[in-house]
Curated annotation (Swiss-Prot):
Function in brief: Catalyzes the glycosylation of flavonoids from UDP-glucose. Uses a wide range of flavonoid substrates including flavonols (quercetin, kaempferol, isorhamnetin, 3-OH 7,2',4'-MeO-flavone), flavones (luteolin, apigenin), flavanones (naringenin, hesperetin), flavanonols (taxifolin), isoflavones (genistein, daidzein), flavonol glycosides (quercitrin, isoquercitrin, rutin), and chalcones (isoliquiritigenin).
Family label: Belongs to the UDP-glycosyltransferase family.
Enzyme Commission code: 2.4.1.-, 2.4.1.237
Classification of source organism: Eukaryota, Viridiplantae, Streptophyta, Embryophyta, Tracheophyta
PROSITE patterns, per database record: UDPGT
Protein name: UDP-glucosyl transferase 73B2
Gene Ontology process terms (BP): flavonol biosynthetic process; response to other organism
Tissue: Expressed in roots and flowers.
Induction, as annotated: Not induced by salicylic acid.
Pfam family, one: UDPGT
Amino-acid positions noted as binding an anthocyanidin in the UniProt annotation, renumbered to this chain: 22, 395
A GO term for molecular function: flavonol 3-O-glucosyltransferase activity
Swiss-Prot/TrEMBL keywords: Flavonoid biosynthesis, Glycosyltransferase, Transferase
Pathway listed: Secondary metabolite biosynthesis; flavonoid biosynthesis
Length: 483
């Protein structure tokens, strides 16, 4: 009986929050587990399943015999007080309505509707474990009813979790004279300096504050945490996290590195708004390390005045660039200086919508990355060996910036100083954009940063190879939940 059990495939269920920044790494994770012999099931809604199906089909064609599938849950948006077709945070970030923030909070709470469906599925399927997004705190209780271990997937790294923990425990922001006065985060290794304006609002009385308390409590009761990170990137913080915050944690990243082929890299997320081959051909015509790639992820939003400053700053820097803007051609182009595209023709490329990010970052012509410091983007930049210009907007991005600029020392801050609840960026002048872009690409300090970044990229690749830290952590996770 015992030996039969070991021949049975480990069955892992994955339940990502419905946002690209959560679904893409979860898809990578499900592919990784099935490539190591597990059966992976991703739980999502009908509209979101369409985003995942094509990359899953590609993966299955490349790896016949591996098991990965999708289980669809019902999400009646209108009944839940949400607009029709609103099954992904992208719905709000693509349509900048006045009540966007209110609706996003409603969206978070509406996901509780999945609880009964999840319990029904767990009762009939009994997987070996459930890796559910941090934003589904009720999943711990649902899984517990059927003795299914629930793991939390955070979608961020050790550093930001430790920083948030230390600030939550010690509340150093209460002891400074003003919200812009810098302070050192107590207990956190590395003497990390931050301001109150840059930390996540800890208002425990707001709806979102209460929700985040629930998130933390459900993590304490869970069977542990799975992280998209690797030990060498943030070893001090991995050790701190496991000794002070959550004893059971496994790092299995960087997940983007497992996508080896052109097709797999091109199919992460939405269909790109540019032909991938055309984009790579443009990069092929540029010198190594000469192009700056500018992208602020799928959620951050900038007003036209800010986009205008970015355009002017890029033009002033004289650097070749690829700039991803969440705009369509139909938008009146008031956010661009007059004649801008004509003047930068051949030197700059604007992609409106979605870009094949990993393909661009991995290209030898790309020499730097202007990023909002979302964890997925940051890790993709690390894996590509790129120095970064950090421009955090909201969520845990200011913590991630500190990791890049103060710990890894592979980045230059553009000077964003305020955490924005609505993910609308702090205003930065063209002069600051120009200065940061030049600083990250040229000069002696830039070469030092590039050397450090290349070293980290080599460590990232080694971590996922046989015998690497993430390879071994995945092994120990699979052994733990198979027994």
């Amino acid at each position: 009986m015992g030996s039969d059990h070991h021949h049975r495939k480990l069955h892992v269920m994955f339940f990502p929050f419905m946002a690209y920044g959560h679904m893409i790494p979860t898809l990578d994770m499900a592919k990784l587990f099935s490539s190591r012999g597990a059966k992976s099931t991703i739980l999502t809604t009908s509209l979101n399943s369409k985003i995942l199906q094509k990359p899953i089909d590609t993966f299955k064609n490349l790896n016949p015999g591996l098991e990965i599938d999708i289980q669809i849950f019902n999400f009646p948006c209108v009944e839940l007080g949400l607009p029709e077709g609103c099954e992904n945070v992208d719905f709000f970030t693509s349509n900048n309505n006045d009540d966007k923030n209110e609706m996003i909070v409603k969206f978070f709470f509406s996901t509780r509707f999945f609880k009964d469906q999840l319990e029904k599925l767990l009762g009939t399927t009994r997987p070996d474990c459930l890796i559910a997004d941090m934003f589904f705190p009720w999943a711990t209780e649902a899984a517990g009813k059927f003795n299914v271990p629930r793991l939390v997937f955070h979608g961020t790294g050790y550093f930001s979790l430790c920083a948030g923990y230390c600030i939550g425990v010690h509340k150093p922001q209460k002891r400074v004279a003003s919200s812009s006065e810098p302070f050192v985060i107590p207990e956190l290794p590395g003497n990390i300096v931050i301001t109150e304006e840059q930390i996540i609002d800890g208002d425990g009385e707001s709806d979102m504050g209460k929700f985040m308390t629930e998130v933390r409590e459900s993590e304490v009761k869970s069977s542990g945490v799975v992280l998209n990170s690797f030990y060498e990137l943030e070893h001090d913080y991995a050790d701190f996290y496991k000794s002070c915050v959550q004893k059971r944690a496994w790092h299995i990243g960087p997940l983007s590195v497992y996508n080896r082929g052109f097709e797999e890299k091109a199919e992460r997320g939405k269909k790109a708004n540019i032909d991938e081959a055309e984009c790579l051909k443009w990069l092929d015509s540029k010198k190594p390390n000469s192009v700056i790639y500018v992208s602020f992820g799928s959620v951050a939003f900038f007003k036209n005045e800010q986009l205008f400053e970015i355009a002017a700053g890029l033009e002033a820097s004289g650097t070749s660039f690829i700039w991803v803007v969440r705009k369509t051609k139909d938008d009146r182009e008031e956010w661009l200086p007059e004649g801008f595209e004509e003047r930068v023709k051949g030197k700059g490329m604007i992609i409106r919508g979605w870009a094949p990010q990993v393909l661009i970052l991995d290209h030898q012509a790309t020499g730097g990355f202007v990023t909002h410091c979302g964890w997925n983007s940051l890790l993709e930049g690390v894996a590509a060996g790129l120095p970064m210009v950090t421009w955090p907007v909201g969520a845990e991005q200011f913590y991630n910036e500190k990791l890049v600029t103060q710990v890894l020392r592979t980045g230059v801050s553009v000077g964003a100083s305020k955490h924005m609840k609505v993910m609308m960026g702090d205003f930065i002048s063209r002069e600051k954009v120009d200065k940061a872009v030049r600083e990250v690409l040229a000069g002696e300090a830039a070469e030092e940063r590039r050397r450090r970044a290349k070293k980290l990229a080599a460590m990232a690749k080694a971590a996922v190879e046989e015998g690497g830290s993430s390879f071994n952590d995945l092994n120990s996770f699979m052994e733990e939940f198979s027994s």
